[in-house]
Curated annotation (Swiss-Prot):
Subunit structure: F-type ATPases have 2 components, F(1) - the catalytic core - and F(0) - the membrane proton channel. F(1) has five subunits: alpha(3), beta(3), gamma(1), delta(1), epsilon(1). F(0) has three main subunits: a(1), b(2) and c(10-14). The alpha and beta chains form an alternating ring which encloses part of the gamma chain. F(1) is attached to F(0) by a central stalk formed by the gamma and epsilon chains, while a peripheral stalk is formed by the delta and b chains.
NCBIfam families, A to Z: PRK06568.1 (NF005129)
Keywords: ATP synthesis, Cell inner membrane, Cell membrane, CF(0), Hydrogen ion transport, Ion transport, Membrane, Transmembrane, Transmembrane helix, Transport
InterPro entries: ATP_synth_b/b'su_bac/chlpt (IPR002146)
Entry protein name: ATP synthase subunit b
Species: Rickettsia bellii (strain RML369-C)
Subcellular location per the Swiss-Prot or TrEMBL entry: Cell inner membrane
Taxonomic lineage: Bacteria, Pseudomonadati, Pseudomonadota, Alphaproteobacteria, Rickettsiales
Regions that span the bilayer: 1-21
GO CC terms of this entry: plasma membrane; proton-transporting ATP synthase complex
Membrane topology listed for this record: Single-pass membrane protein
Predominant location: membrane
Length: 157
């Protein structure tokens, strides 16, 4: 190969041309690659931030769920206590009502007994008066002593 040969100079020119083109293009390519690297890094940082935010949100949600479960248990316990108290109060009221009705019923029975006893006494007294009247009318002898009258009356009964 000779230095004056055109293919040699063509090759040298091509190498110089490629070098001259590559040099500014190298800066543009490197700048573009650097921008892509920065963009990827930003995306990775955003993804990590989103991941951390999601993890924090998940932990907060779990904490809220635990709080709600504790609140639910507390409310259930309070409701059971209130229900038990109401049941006891109503049971006591019913027992007092039944006791009151029992006392009223006993008083009513006693008053009915007294009324029946009085009616029987009145009937008995009326019957005795009737028997004594009949006896006096039938004997027409009013000269008897009280003991004789009682004896005769008892014999008739």
């Amino acid at each position: 190969m000779h230095f004056l040969d055109e293919s040699f100079w063509l090759a040298i020119s091509f190498i110089i041309f490629v070098y001259l083109i590559y040099r500014p293009a190298k800066k543009a390519i490197l700048k573009s690659l650097d921008m892509k690297v920065l963009e990827v890094q930003e995306r990775v940082l955003k993804a990590e931030k989103l991941k951390d935010d999601a993890k924090l949100l998940f932990e907060q949600t779990e904490e809220q769920i635990k709080n709600l479960e504790a609140l639910q248990l507390q409310m259930t316990k309070e409701n059971n206590e209130i229900t038990e108290k109401i049941v006891q109060e109503k049971t006591k009221e019913i027992e007092e009502f039944l006791e009151h009705k029992k006392v009223e019923t006993i008083k009513l029975i006693e008053s009915q007994k007294l009324l029946a006893s009085k009616e029987l006494q009145d009937e008995f007294s009326d019957e005795v008066v009737k028997l004594v009247s009949e006896y006096f009318h039938s004997t027409k002898n009013n000269n008897l002593s009280e003991t004789d009258i009682a004896k005769n009356l008892m014999d008739k009964v």
